[in-house]
Amino acid sequence: MEIPEKLKLEYLLALDTHIETVGKENKEGTMKRIFEITREIADLGFGEKDIHEIAKDEDLYVRYETWRKSKNI
């Protein structure tokens, strides 16, 4: 079983948004979203190692950029 692509893309988007966000209150909101997605992934039975692999997957980043552009995000 693999983490659903949609969750992987949402996780990367949440990370990007957090990095780009300015201000403590805004950072708290983006961090909350990262935790929500992490919880969804964990609820599917995946662990910390699986979540770390998302950020290391270069092919996923290519698909992420294409997805982000197609969604105008």
Describe each model-derived feature in a short phrase:
Residues 19-65:
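Acidic, low-complexity, intrinsically disordered interaction modules
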Residues 1-2, 66-73:
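Short intrinsically disordered terminal tails
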Residues 12, 41, 70-73:
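Intrinsically disordered and other compositionally biased segments
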